[in-house]
């Protein structure tokens, strides 16, 4: 059945949560409801009435297909039960990987202080974050959907656990690092770093906290980028405090939202598996997120000599000097335009310096001196290699994007829309003089900035990378830098498949708990991908595991079924994501999902089970699911 629950937020906004629920009775014969599927909020849908109509049809179809007919050939009597519950058993494959990470041992030490099993809660939240990401409240409502799992906890206990997870974040990451090394190995000859931000479902920023400085410091105005506040109390005592900024701050959002955001930096190994992460206030500059995480990896994770690979946002003098002073290397992209690229202007357009491979690729590489600061603060001269190259495919892509914006800019001139800020307004320039007469214009007008377009065209397809590794040739530099795509994809996964944002919790320990849950979920998925040689995407892995459902029928028999009931519903509401699926495409997706499942189970010590199986045999099958070594 469909259930609509209204929720009133602190700002007075009322939203209607949409769920499909099934009724059941607990051990005390008390009526209860369990959430089968959650569909977000009604107010967020483009057409709420059409959405509800489609959902009602979907629910009728779901109930009809839950009814199980057992033929005479099965030797079991015919059975039909409208109220039978469909359970999820695909989680067992994720649990098999999770168990190899040995996090339960750490949680059990903490668990002695708690009245509830936080090890099981953490595992439950990680698995649900992969299979069915949602708010903690909605996740709790699905607590009985996993076959064979019984959780004795309240929603309040689940929220309290988040604070414990937040406090244990660093310990969890250290244990993960050790176990991943032994499970699939780590290659840290190169490590990849990037940062992104995530927005909150809240309008207000979090307040800063202040911590007293003991002993007092002199000659400093900041401690590790934290401003020192000097105070004299009523009794004349002089005190110092350092400001600890809250995490929820407005900053430069990568998704262009105005809500408070939080920064996350992520360090990843050469295999594409995360090493560690850290969160920062939302107004933290990207370039300031690298060193705290790199220092943590070097100090607590035993990270040896490595080459740090990052984009131009991390290309600062301090980051470069610190990496080299620590005995590490660096590889950053380099800006070619403007003041930051001034030193390369003469070389960029000197065709005689390039080695031409074909019409789409030419390059030049050279070693240059640069000014640096050593560990003792002395100015020194060091060397680095610079690769400048032209890529024809990139040039054509950049030209096409610019042509689209210029076309929109021209159109805006005809309908007077140029006063509104758009992505294309940078190609417009204000006219101060009448073009034909040279007289001062009596009213503001705009024209296409042809000079800017011409200047941009010069750099189409041009790219530069600087590195400390003087022995790397141009091919190895490009190949190494290309590895950054995996960390960019990881951010996409956290925002789509894992739905890390919007963030609903606001307590800072809860926020850190939320992030470590998502981090572990990402690690679990990456481990499985690594075992499968990255043959299928995370999206397809999740879809295949969500296909694995079962329901208990008469005489201790389990019906193991392929869950494809959402196919019809996806077809009806595909406009939500502006994707039009045909019946043939949906059938193809389902067929692909079955084949993906067959690929996944090859990495486990288990076999396919039949659609009708005794309960004891089914549970033996589930126990046999272990990750292959």
Enumerate the predicted regions with their spans:
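Anion-binding and metal-coordination hotspots
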Residues: 2-3, 17, 28-31, 101-629
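Conserved glycine(s) in the ABC-transporter nucleotide-binding domain "signature"
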Residues: 1-119
């Amino acid at each position: 059945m469909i259930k609509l629950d209204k929720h009133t937020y602190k700002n007075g906004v009322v939203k209607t949560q949409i769920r499909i629920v099934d009724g059941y009775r607990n051990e005390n014969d008390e009526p209860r409801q369990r959430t089968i599927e959650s569909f977000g909020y009604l107010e967020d849908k483009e057409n709420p009435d059409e959405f509800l109509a489609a959902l009602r049809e979907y629910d009728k179809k779901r109930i009809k297909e839950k009814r199980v007919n057992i033929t005479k050939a099965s030797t079991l009597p015919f059975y039909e039960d409208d109220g039978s519950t469909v359970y999820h058993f695909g989680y067992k494959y994720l649990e098999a990987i999770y168990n190899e990470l040995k996090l339960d041992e750490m949680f059990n030490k903490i668990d002695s202080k708690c009245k509830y099993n936080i090890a099981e809660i953490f595992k439950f939240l990680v698995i649900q974050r992969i299979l069915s990401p949602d708010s903690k409240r909605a996740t709790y409502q699905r607590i009985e959907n996993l076959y064979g799992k019984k959780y004795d906890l309240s929603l309040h206990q689940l929220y309290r656990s988040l604070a414990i997870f937040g406090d244990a974040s660093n310990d969890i990451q250290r244990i993960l690092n050790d176990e991943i090394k032994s499970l699939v190995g780590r290659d840290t000859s190169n490590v990849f770093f990037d940062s992104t931000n995530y927005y909150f479902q809240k309008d207000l920023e979090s307040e800063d906290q202040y911590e007293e400085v003991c002993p007092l410091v002199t000659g400093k105005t900041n401690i590790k980028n934290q401003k020192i506040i000097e105070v004299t109390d009523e009794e004349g005592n002089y005190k110092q405090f350092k400001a600890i900024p809250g995490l929820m701050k407005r900053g430069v959002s990568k998704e262009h939202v105005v809500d408070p955001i939080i920064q996350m930096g992520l360090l990843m190994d050469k295999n594409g598996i995360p090493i560690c992460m850290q969160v920062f206030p939302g107004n933290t500059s990207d370039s300031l997120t690298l060193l705290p995480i790199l220092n943590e990896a070097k100090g607590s994770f035993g990270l040896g000599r490595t080459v740090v690979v990052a984009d131009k946002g991390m290309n600062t003098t301090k980051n470069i000097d610190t990496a080299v002073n620590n005995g590490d290397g660096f590889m950053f992209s380099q800006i070619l335009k403007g003041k930051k690229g001034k030193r390369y202007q003469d070389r960029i357009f000197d065709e005689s310096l390039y080695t031409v491979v074909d019409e789409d690729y030419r390059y030049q590489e050279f070693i240059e001196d640069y000014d640096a600061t050593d560990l003792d603060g002395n100015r020194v001269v060091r060397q680095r290699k610079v690769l400048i190259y032209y890529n024809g495919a990139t040039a054509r892509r950049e030209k096409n994007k610019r042509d689209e914006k210029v076309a929109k800019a021209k159109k805006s001139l005809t309908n007077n829309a140029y006063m509104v800020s758009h992505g294309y307004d940078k190609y417009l320039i204000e006219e101060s003089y009448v073009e034909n007469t040279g007289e001062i214009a009596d009213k503001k007008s705009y024209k296409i900035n042809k000079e800017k377009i011409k200047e941009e065209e010069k750099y189409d397809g041009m790219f530069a990378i600087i590195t400390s590794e003087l022995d790397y040739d141009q091919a190895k530099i490009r190949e190494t830098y290309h590895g950054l795509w995996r960390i960019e994809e990881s951010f996409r996964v956290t925002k789509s498949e894992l739905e890390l944002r919007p963030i609903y919790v606001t307590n800072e320990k809860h926020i850190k708990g939320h992030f470590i849950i998502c981090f572990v979920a990402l690690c679990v998925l990456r481990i499985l991908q690594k075992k499968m040689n990255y043959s299928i995407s995370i999206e397809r892995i999740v879809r295949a595991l969500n296909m694995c459902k079962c329901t208990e029928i008469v005489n201790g028999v389990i019906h193991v079924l392929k869950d494809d009931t959402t196919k019809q519903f996806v077809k009806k509401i595909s406009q939500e994501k502006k994707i039009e699926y045909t019946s043939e495409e949906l059938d193809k997706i389902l067929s692909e999902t079955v084949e993906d499942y067959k690929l996944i189970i090859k990495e486990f010590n288990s076999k396919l089970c039949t659609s009708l199986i005794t309960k004891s045999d089914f549970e033996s099958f589930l126990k046999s699911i272990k990750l292959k070594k």
